[in-house]
Amino acid sequence: MSLPTLPEATDAGTSEPPKTQSRAPRIRSWAAGVYGQAAANALLLGVLINSGNRGLLSGLPGGYSAGTGDHYVLSSMGLHWADPTRYAGDWFLEAAPQPHWFFDTLTYLGSSLGILDLVYVLFWCFGLAAFGLAVAFLSRKWAPSMPWMFGAATTVLASLSPWMVVGTGSSMLALAIPAVVSANLVFLFIAAALTGRSRWMLAAAVLTAVVHVQQGAVVAVLLAALIVVHVVRHRVLPKATSAALAATAAIVAAGLTARPVAANTGDFVDICNELIAYHCAAQLWGTSTVLYSLATIGLALFTVMYEPSGNRPVWGAVVGLPMIGLSLGLMANVLSVPFFGELAQGLNVYRLGALVMPFAIMGLLLPLFRLGNKHLLAVLPLLLFTWEYLLSDSWAPVIPASAAFAAAYLAVVLIPVVVRSRRPERAVMTTRLSASALILLFLGTAVGTGSLTFRSLNTTYIPNAEVREWGEAVEKAVPPGESLLAPPLASYIRAATYRGVIADCKNIPYGGVPWAEWQERLGDLGGRDQCLDRNPQAYNGQSSEQLDRIAEKYDIRYMVVEQGQSDRIPELRELGWSTVLEPVNTIQNVVLHKTG
């Protein structure tokens, strides 16, 4: 397929342009084509995510960050490979290694070469590029008269959307982690399948399996569905797709064999119900969360209206199948259907939520770019889904529910429907103006709520300088191989010091013996309920004698006493503990050591 090109500049009277200028039209052609649009989408998305403040709601910095959040769990193994003194003897690292071998390798390479900050931000940018390319592919098929406007609207709305989608983290999370990058790769896989770009589709499939084993398994199922569609329609087995399926399945099988995601399905269901209900226990969700999830899926299913009838079987294989599977699993879980409800949890059907968001956004844009008087029956259910997904406070605090915003939104998206029905010759111009107004409405609202703060990109691993400085001091004071007695809620301690801990509320095994051991360890440290209610008193309320006995049980010789607990230091000294590190900065933590 040839890409659309810009008109060449009018000859200014010279007989032949110099050869040094011959590349200019090609560069302009590339910039105006699908790959130029993809780059623009990716850049816009990166700027908006880095300017976003959703992270502040969950204890993360604003914008992109590294060495925070899920990096507390996912970076440890690669850092240990690069420097065996880091996390040496850490119980969690030895008992429950994470399944992300590729991310471990990236971390190892980045840390070994002293460029971990750069490696992580490039990994994040790789995900942005995948998203940008997917949007560019689809915009040229679904909105061929104005692909750039469709792409910009999709990108802006996606960047402001909620970070939790049907129980799983969105691809808009401002972190360089496998879940984020793989979600964007799956989006690219689906977009390439829908637009007939087979090479990109097959490459995205294999890359997804490399980056994230669970999402690789999802892509393997979608590849199998595409093969079935192809065989039914053409009576021949697609060799390239079959080879990609074999490669993807092999990578997934190898990854799961080397590092099983969940050692015991029953244990994983218990973990869902007791510790991470927001992620995979829909029977415990509130009604509003369930309705929001169903509306998200419903909007994604509406994207079938963009597809010509001849390509809808392909859409059914890569969009319809996972969306229907997710909705069935969700409802089986919500209704606690015997066997099937727990099966949905055990298989972690909620991983499919990562596929939903970009298609839900494009479903929102249907009235703006496609619907007319032939589709009036579809407008009402679409608006009902839109109301639940967008206008019922689900996007708060970025986009708060308000009558003014709802009225402005409905006017912007419905005016093109009316014009397209009555004055089709003005439809393109009206759509352009309305799409521009929609983008300004969302950006203006986000700025007005303080949800966008334009900032420079901070790629530093552990961006908080004081936490980083304190962690470096502890790393020097506590010998390699030693672990720390520390509050379970203070997950930053393990991450910043590169020393193991007895257990914390962030590093939780997915089942088996490690899960039982984690429960015992948390029980000794004040109980696992503190991980749910975020109550530090469960640990801090224990006596100095109790803490001393815990240290003895787990052969721990170093203890972190956080600010606010310094009154217990004299008692601990009487029990044989001595200070090895005084407060370093405003983080008024003290590190104690016990000999013998």
What role is predicted for each listed range?
Residues 449-454, 459-537, 544-568:
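Short periplasmic/luminal acceptor-recognition loop of GT-C membrane glycosyltransferases, typified by
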Residues 180-200:
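Membrane-interface transmembrane helices that cradle and orient dolichyl/undecaprenyl
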Residues 155-163, 209-214, 249-259, 322-334, ...:
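Aromatic-anchored segments of alpha-helical transmembrane domains
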Residues 50-71, 82-100, 210-221, 225-365, ...:
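Transmembrane catalytic cores of multi-pass membrane glycosyltransferases
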Residues 18-31, 193-200, 228-240, 361-380, ...:
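Membrane-interface junctions at the ends of membrane-embedded or membrane-associated helices
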Residues 158-163, 382-420, 431-461:
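Transmembrane alpha-helical segments
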Residues 35-159, 163-184, 210-215:
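Active-site lumenal/periplasmic loops and adjacent helix-entry segments of GT-C-fold
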Residues 1-55, 413-440:
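Start-transfer (signal-anchor) and selected internal transmembrane alpha helices
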